[in-house]
Amino acid sequence: VTDLRARRHRETRAEIVAAGLRLFDEHGYDAVTMEQIAAAAGVSRRTLYRHFPAKDRILLDLPLEWMAMWDDVVAAAPADLPPRDVVERAARVIGAHLDAEAGRIGIAWRIIDSVPALEPAFLANPTWTERVVAVMEDPARGAPLDRRIAVIVAGAYLGALDAAMLAWAAGAGGDTVADTIELIIERLAPIWP
């Protein structure tokens, strides 16, 4: 019963996110109401608000997926894998996912780019920075990096990724997210200590 309940919870969230993205894309983020999203998703307002207390939380569901992927890759990485390899592996996994979900990811990034108030929640934020820094400071992965250096490296990666994703969503970012991630990995390799 618990597995069924958890699966239904995930399915409902996915239906709400899909409906929200579709409406945001068709009508603009600011023009869409929570009531319209509930109707388009085929759920009650109560169900919608139980899953997402505000409109921006529907968009925030996407980076939360990516954070969960990041956490899974980091947890599955051998303890002695160097931090750079762990960070690059996680970035590649997320990039492949973003390419597989290019339609909805592109819509989300275009919305983020068109609504400046949403950008701080999505772009290189402290939560992402701390996840990357934690990998670099992990003593099991070798000598931990000085925190200042770890924050600088994390900021460089995340800033480059944010800029690349905004360009990609606008149609100027190249072929795939995976290609862009490879370019970032290649160009930023010299900053690793």
What are these regions (language model features)?
Residues 43-52:
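Short hydrophobic/aromatic patch on the recognition helix
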Residues 1-43, 60:
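Basic, helix-initiating cap at the start of DNA-binding domains
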Residues 109, 140, 164-172:
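Secondary-structure edge/capping motif, primarily at the C-terminal ends of alpha-helices
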Residues 133-138, 170-193:
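C-terminal peripheral helix-coil segments that are non-catalytic and often amphipathic
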Residues 116-141, 148-155, 163:
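Amphipathic alpha-helical packing segments from all-alpha helical-bundle domains
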